[in-house]
């Protein structure tokens, strides 16, 4: 695919995600089905609650990941700068958008070592699609992607549904697992594997764990539906009808998270996919997530300014802190012991 076509596709994606009413879906994350048991005697000071954690040897001030968003649109440079600057200020992790376009064209789209200079102290994660990893140049792409942004780890994103539905998508996924194994064995940094909104199942998580992947991002259904996005940008009624049938396809985020954590309790997990606020964040952490990611929820702020991104996450962090306070949790480890009950099952 030509650089211009790839760039236009990325711009289309941004425009649609910024206007979610254009990509309608009804599936929800599942977090709305769960409630914390309220603690009326927390016996701690709100300001003393410790939200810090560590990722890939770096200290984070809160367990939040700015999930991968954009890496191939003309707007990407400013968006990624705003995100990186905010992540540095708040002590959050950041995953860059797909680096395919930057690797295959002469334009780096802002995905260079300059991004690391905006955010010298945070965990920064490079990002490539499974289709690129599975190509003949896959290992070279992986190494270059990490070097390009001086990353602490590489994210490999799995998006078979989106690829099957989009014009010019990568539809031959044979050998992807073997390619992931090669990258895991060859890279000097950890490898994280994520879905993009349809969720990871326990059998797939098992395959990835056996391949040596360090961390999984369940990236479940309930947030951005890439099937609906591709349906919105489809060039024909036929393509639109096929895509929109899958608008609610996938494993809801809470379900994917709980199932994988139960099956692999020692596997570090990221919960993303429709995380709305700090209460969803707290629920995800209590269900077994090590980190919680947001993308679409902060994209509008990221197109505006660093200050807007800071304002967005300041709200999320304060919501998380209050959730800890009202469950009597002085730290993230304590929050993971807080009682969650499914709505209707409370005793």
Swiss-Prot record:
Binding of substrate occurs at 9-10, 98-100, 162
A single GO molecular function, which one? oxidoreductase activity
What the entry lists under NCBIfam families is as follows: IPP_isom_2
- Catalytic activity from the UniProt record: isopentenyl diphosphate = dimethylallyl diphosphate
- Keyword Transferase, does the record have it? no
> What cofactor is this protein dependent on?
FMN; NADPH; Mg(2+)
Q: Upper taxonomic classification of the species?
A: Bacteria, Pseudomonadati, Pseudomonadota, Gammaproteobacteria, Enterobacterales
Keywords for the protein's UniProt record, in alphabetical order: Cytoplasm, Flavoprotein, FMN, Isomerase, Isoprene biosynthesis, Magnesium, Metal-binding, NADP
Primary localization class, coarse: cytoplasm
For Mg(2+), which residues are the binding ones? 163
Q: What is this protein called?
A: Isopentenyl-diphosphate delta-isomerase
Look up the domain of life of the source: Bacteria
Q: What is its EC number?
A: 5.3.3.2
Q: How does it assemble?
A: Homooctamer. Dimer of tetramers.
Q: Where in the cell is it found?
A: Cytoplasm
UniProt xrefs under CDD domains = IDI-2_FMN
- Does NADP show up as a keyword for this record? yes
Q: Which is an annotated Pfam family here?
A: FMN_dh
Q: What does this protein do?
A: Involved in the biosynthesis of isoprenoids. Catalyzes the 1,3-allylic rearrangement of the homoallylic substrate isopentenyl (IPP) to its allylic isomer, dimethylallyl diphosphate (DMAPP).
Spell out the GO cellular component terms annotated for this protein, sorted alphabetically and separated by semicolons: cytoplasm
Binding annotation for FMN: 67-70, 98, 127, 194, 224, 274-276, 295-296
Q: Name one GO biological process term.
A: isoprenoid biosynthetic process
Return the SUPFAM superfamilies for the record.
Answer: FMN-linked oxidoreductases
Similarity comment: Belongs to the IPP isomerase type 2 family.
């Amino acid at each position: 695919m030509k650089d211009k076509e790839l760039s236009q596709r990325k711009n289309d994606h941004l425009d649609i995600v910024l206007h979610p009413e254009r990509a309608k879906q009804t599936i929800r994350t599942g977090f709305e089905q769960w409630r914390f048991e309220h603690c009326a005697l927390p016996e701690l000071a709100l300001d003393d609650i410790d939200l810090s954690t560590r990722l890939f040897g770096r200290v984070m001030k809160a367990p939040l990941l700015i999930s991968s968003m954009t890496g191939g649109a003309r707007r990407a440079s400013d968006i990624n700068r705003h995100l990186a600057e905010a992540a540095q200020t708040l002590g959050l992790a950041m995953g860059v958008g797909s680096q395919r376009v930057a690797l295959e064209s002469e334009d780096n789209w802002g995905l260079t070592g300059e991004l690391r200079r905006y955010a010298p102290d945070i965990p920064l994660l490079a990002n490539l699609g499974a289709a690129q990893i599975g190509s003949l140049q896959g290992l070279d792409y992986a190494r270059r992607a990490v070097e390009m942004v001086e990353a602490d780890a590489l994210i490999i994103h799995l998006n078979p549904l989106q690829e099957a539905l989009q014009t010019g998508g990568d539809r031959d996924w044979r050998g992807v697992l073997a390619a992931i194994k090669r990258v895991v064995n060859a890279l000097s940094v950890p490898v994280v594997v994520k879905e993009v909104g349809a969720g990871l199942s326990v059998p797939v998580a098992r395959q990835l764990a056996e391949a040596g992947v360090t961390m999984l991002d369940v990236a479940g259904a309930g947030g951005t539906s890439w099937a609906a996005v591709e349906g919105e940008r489809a060039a024909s009624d036929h393509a639109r009808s096929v895509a929109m049938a899958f608008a609610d396809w996938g494993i809801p985020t809470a379900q994917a998270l709980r199932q994988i954590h139960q099956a692999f309790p020692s596997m570090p997990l990221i919960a993303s996919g429709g995380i709305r606020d700090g209460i969803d964040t707290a629920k995800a952490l209590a269900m077994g997530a090590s980190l919680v990611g947001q993308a679409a929820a902060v994209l509008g702020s990221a197109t505006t300014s660093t200050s807007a991104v800071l304002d967005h996450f300041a709200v999320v962090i304060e919501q998380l802190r209050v959730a800890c306070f009202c469950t009597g949790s002085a730290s993230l480890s304590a929050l993971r012991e807080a009682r969650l009950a499914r709505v209707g099952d409370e005793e």
